[in-house]
Amino acid sequence: MSKKQKNETSAKAPVKLTRAEKKEIQAVIRKYKGDGKPHSAQTSIPYEAMYQDGVCRVTPRTFSKCIEFTDISYQLAQADTKTAIFENLCDLYNYLDASIHVQFSFINCKIDPKQYAKSFEIRAQGDDFDDIRSEYSDILQDQLVNGNNGLMKRKFMTYTIEADSLKMARARLRRIETDLLGYFKSMGASAWGLDAKQRLEVMHSIFHPDGEPFSFDWKWLAPSGLSTKDFIAPSSFRFGNARMFGLGGKYGAVSFLQILSPELSDEMLADFLNTENGIVVNLHVQAIDQSDAIKTVKRKITDLDAMKIQEQKRAVRSGYDMDILPSDLATYGQDAKELLKTLQSRNERMFQLTFLVLNTADTRQKLENDVFWASGIAQKYNCSLVRLDYQQEQGLMSSLPLGASHIQIERSLTTSSVAVFVPFVTQELFQGGDAMYYGINAKTGNMIMLDRKRARCPNGLKLGTPGSGKSMSCKSEILSVFLCTPDDVYICDPEAEYYPLVKRLHGQVVKLSPTSKNYVNPLDINLNYSEDENPLALKSDFVLSFCELVMGGKNGLEAIEKTVIDRAVQVIYRPYLADPKPENMPILADLHKALLDQHIPEADRVAQALDLYVSGSLNVFNHRTNIDIKNRIVAFDIKELGKQLKKIGMLIVQDQIWGRVTQNRSKGKATWYFCDEFHLLLREEQTAAFSCEIWKRFRKWGGIPTGATQNVKDLLSSPEIENILENSDFICLLNQASGDRKILAERLNISPQQLRYVDNSEPGEGLLIYENVILPFKNPIPKNTQLYQIMTTRLGEGATV
């Protein structure tokens, strides 16, 4: 203010107010001065600042950070696995000292169903497959409605410390986060720290239970003058009612768990979370300094001893036995001494636990029903769920993952008692992007959506007894690949089961038989056949496998026989490698001649075995390839090859598909290969070794093979089965015979609880193993659909073709 303005101001005569005007002004001041209570939704949210790296200043000297972690399969795990998880969880709690407050938050929040359904939508393309797309989409939508995928289940751990400055807080929070992530990793759970935007999104989901989209950008704050709270707050809070509150257009209520049971179950928390309703469960855990805890227990024992002495004195004065004490006093004394022993001699500490349950609903009646349901869960475990009277606001704010509890209702528990609330139930498999449908989780009802290409090794196996739904499972996956990806699909079909599906998808069926005019040359090769400079090395392995099957015998090929075959291979491919024209491609007759030209007994013996396949009645493979494969989906029907040629036919088909894989690799296209009766390729030593080598190479070249068989014992008895299993991150187990169940449980580390799902299971039900996750699943396909008709192999149910 300038001197002139000051002079002008001072020159003005003071305004005199009447008594009435003074009263009016004082009333206005009182009105707007406030009563110390928040008067906006934003000011009710109890934190001071949120920083971009995810650190939150809750109070001037209190800072918190948040970790999100994934679920793991705990309830169906092996007993020793459950014990290991529990012990690691105890170690995590014991890591916490009295300066760290921890809050576990389990949030079941709804998401926008329309947005969610878009991920399953298969758009019409105006071709002959739109009716299939529509029917397939309807099945996915039905599963979405029947399951509880409308809820997103998320798990968080928020940890809070006190510090004199933000800089000091950040340094310590970072160290704690590193340690906590290590504990989660040891339990098999993925975990990661959240930044500020992610933390705000979590709080937004609690304040907007309907799944309203969250929009926020740091650039918006300065121009708008808004704070981070403005982007997460609901339209209003209403805390007038003592036992519930209003949240925008919703109703909510917070209750606390009164732990009355002498023993706690590790299934209680899982039961609270196993609901189709929106629920938020919070566990606030505060460690007590060990020396303080021991002193407190000792004081209690001293107090109990004093009471015991008083009772004994009273007994003496009254003239009855001084050893007769009130039962409660004796029990409390024993419990206190046992607790002291636990704290002093075992790896146990003391914690204060506050267990809060937040329910939200559209109407008061629905809210009361949800709270009643939650109370029933507590009652099941001999506990009580008590509504927070006149503390609903504090309860709601304590349910935010900020790491601060405003409810002073605590229960003292030891490490193992707190760890009983295991934060894991069962893992879900729900990947976004190009994931495909593989059924529903039999434990939770949620859809299983997977993208096998994301696996370390996408190779797969499908094992099951006859009638267990093995072929149906393969066909369902083939259909998903066809509808959802541009990939090629090849099928080795020993029983002619895939014809209706392939024809309906306008695919190509290549029928191989002694009387067929479709020919496939087993000696076909292309210059991309192997990643080595010389493609003959891998092709020679194939020819050795072919000759092994031709010659038969239990001991396979002898060393000299392998040498003469390899020598012949080098000779017959020279013309083609010099001038790669189709007419220079060798056939079996060329191999036969090259063997005879060596003029040694071992070569003659191999050539004589080849006679039947060169000039005899089984010469179907002594021709150049005359089929032109241009289709996306191709089935090789080898049913009519007969028993003598079946294994040879499967080996040749596998080699043909390997050639297609090498061609597709240069185009950047994935190639799916489904091989039924896969165990036949693993019986003979050389053939098994070649098949295993191809199995390994598929992954590098963009191939995704799937072997299916009902002869699990034969498969598992192969010397190469270990390599096959190690290179297969996708295994679908359907119903299994008793002996097979035991072998599979041992080989694949399946728990007895999980094994129940492959014991007399219905068709299309079993266990899905994806990388390290084992899930029980169901894959029902309605019988009244076109899809069922073209996929079933049951007599009288399939489509007429």
Description of each model-found segment:
Residues 506-510, 720-733:
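A short helix-turn-beta junction within AAA+ P-loop NTPase domains corresponding to the substrate/partner-engaging
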Residues 748-800:
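Conserved P-loop NTPase
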Residues 480-490:
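Post-Walker A helix-loop "phosphate-sensing" segment adjacent to the P-loop in P-loop NTPases
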Residues 2-424:
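Extended, folded cores of ATP/NTP-driven motor/assembly subunits in large transport
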Residues 470:
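Conserved lysine of the Walker
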Residues 473:
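Hydrophobic positions on the alpha1 helix immediately C-terminal to the Walker A/P-loop
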Residues 72, 79-98, 109, 271-273, ...:
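P-loop NTPase motor domains
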Residues 462:
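Hydrophobic anchor at the beta1->P-loop junction of P-loop NTPases
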